[in-house]
Amino acid sequence: MFFTFLCTSLAFNEESLPSGYRNIKLGMTLDEVKDALKKDFQFGYRGERDVSLMPDQQKILIETDTSRTAPSSFLDKCWFQFYEDKLYIITINVKPTRMDHYSIFSTLSKKYGNPGNINPQKSEWSNDSVIMTLERPLTLKYTDKKVYEKLMEESLVQNTAQEMSAQAFLEGL
């Protein structure tokens, strides 16, 4: 009985996982992210020159760099990946001269509980909609879990078709 109460209390003390950092949230459109980046100098966004179309044609990438535009920021380089005009991955490199891995890990563990998956390279928290990862040396990543799983499923189907084509080619030799 006490154990159940303790677990329930701990669960309510932990915050739900964030869907992004500052005013940039997973699921935002490309234009919404551009507008939010323009208003927040911490990311070092320089406008359209930071936006590129990935070879896949359905994916757009925004890459920011604070080295020239926001040297006092805790952030270094950041990447914002879109699929079907929706933000589905936020990758933030934190400056190791301004912050350390242990401080971020401790803060995240205190706010969101222990990571569900941990190894020497990364710590991962997740729920039904978000995967939040702290990677070494100092990268924080927010991923839309549903979009990620959909893309992984699609890539497995494509690999299977490619494997079948390769097998057919080899059989024809």
Language model segments and positions:
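Bacterial N-terminal signal peptides
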Residues: 1-7
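Non-cytosolic coordination micro-motifs
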Residues: 12-56, 89-173
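Mid-chain, structured segments of secreted extracytoplasmic proteins
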Residues: 55-97
